[in-house]
A protein has these predicted regions:
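Domain-level signature for soluble enzymes in the chorismate/prephenate branch of the shikimate pathway
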Residues: 1-312
Length: 312
């Protein structure tokens, strides 16, 4: 039975994303078709559980539409034993303001919130609960648990976490920006990537020599092959001031010839290339890499003795 670590306790948005992934059959089969949830107290702990062998996979948030990338996830993927992404799911996110039954907004003096959640409802809180003292929580479910335990008056929480703990809500669908969403990924130990679907994402972490034009030359390996880069982000190496690694996402799969050629070029050009995987996205988000069949046939023609590269 496969085990999947996730940011717990029960009722987090991460658990909701994990349930949707498993229902959709997005989890690779390891040890049979059943799986066991393993709630942990941070995204870093979830990824470390995979590295340590305590879990087969981890479901972790990697990006949200309000604040961008989830830095603890990126930093953990960039260092330590390599891990690989096998699936992703984007979840619409809206929060509930959870309280004990019978409590009113006028009685709310303290409010618990996971920092990522607090950032997404900052304007709403300023308008509706301006006097509430904000207290940290390690997850949306933990915020709800603090209400249930009587530690705070209210919580910014997921609807699922509030329901699990028998709480009422002062407001539902709370979010500063309409259509807010979070992208979650399923991460495991390295293995064969999911099959190419035509709507795929490939991600790498690069260490590049500190030399003039090094980054431009690296990015050119994608541009010259018609590969659409969808994310470029730098993070400190944590080993020396002023040194960085670069996260790059592109449209395409390692089995696309253009992407494969770019990866080979990166291996030759960069100090280090960490392959984070190629996996389906469900929908094409950008321009897919161009097919190289025509070029391959032309080259085969030349090898066969045709002066113009035409097949003989």
């Amino acid at each position: 039975m496969a085990s999947i670590a996730y940011l717990g306790p029960a009722g987090t948005f991460t658990e909701g994303a994990l349930l949707q992934m498993t229902d959709a059959g997005m989890v690779p089969q390891r040890g049979g078709g059943d799986w066991r949830p393993l709630p942990v107290d941070s995204t870093t702990a979830a990824l470390d559980a995979v590295r340590d062998g305590a879990a087969d996979f981890a479901c972790v948030p990697i990006e949200n539409s309000i604040d961008g990338s989830i830095m603890p996830t990126l930093d953990s993927l960039a260092i330590g034993t390599p891990l690989q992404v096998f699936a992703e799911l984007t979840l619409d996110v809206a929060f509930s303001i959870a309280v004990k039954p019978g409590r009113t907004a006028a009685e709310v003096r303290t409010l618990a919130a996971f920092p990522v959640a607090a950032a997404q409802v900052r304007q709403w809180l300023a308008a509706h609960l301006p006097a509430a003292e904000l207290r940290p929580a390690i997850s949306n479910a933990d915020a709800a648990q603090q209400v249930a335990d009587g530690l705070v008056d209210a919580a910014v929480s997921s609807p699922l976490a509030a329901t699990h703990r028998g709480l009422s809500t002062l407001a539902e669908g709370v979010v500063d920006e309409a259509n807010a969403c979070t992208r979650f990924v399923l991460v495991g130990r390295p293995g064969p990537p999911p099959a190419r679907t035509g709507a795929d994402r490939t991600s790498v972490v690069l260490r590049i020599d500190n030399a003039p034009g090094a980054l431009v030359s690296t990015l050119a390996e994608f541009g010259m092959r018609g590969i659409d880069l969808t994310r470029i982000e730098s993070r400190p190496t944590r080993t020396e001031l002023g040194t960085y690694v670069f996260f790059l996402d592109c449209v395409g799969h390692i089995d696309d010839d253009a992407v494969a050629e770019a990866l080979k070029a990166l291996h030759q050009r960069c100090t280090d290339v960490r392959y984070l995987g190629s996996w389906p996205t469900g929908a094409v988000a950008g321009a897919p890499p161009p097919p190289s069949d025509d070029a391959a046939r032309w080259l085969a023609g030349l090898r066969g003795g045709a002066a113009d590269g035409s097949a003989r």
